[in-house]
Amino acid sequence: MRAKWRKKRMRRLKRKRRKMRARSK
């Protein structure tokens, strides 16, 4: 159960990181 929501959270974090990087550039 924990692994399931953890995977979803990781994906969201990755998406946020991508947006932040683009803004920095």
Swiss-Prot record:
Region spans: Disordered: 1-25
Keyword terms of this UniProt record: Ribonucleoprotein, Ribosomal protein
Keyword Ribosomal protein: yes
Keyword set includes Ribonucleoprotein: yes
Superkingdom of the source species: Eukaryota
GO molecular function: structural constituent of ribosome
GO cellular component terms, semicolon-separated: ribonucleoprotein complex; ribosome
GO terms, biological process: translation
Family stated for the protein in its record: Belongs to the eukaryotic ribosomal protein eS32 family.
Note: Initially thought to be part of the large ribosomal subunit. Crystal structures show eS32/eL41 to be a small ribosomal subunit forming a bridge at the interface of the 2 subunits.
Subunit structure, interactors included: Component of the small ribosomal subunit.
Name the UniProt record assigns to this protein: Small ribosomal subunit protein eS32
Gene that produces this protein: RpL41
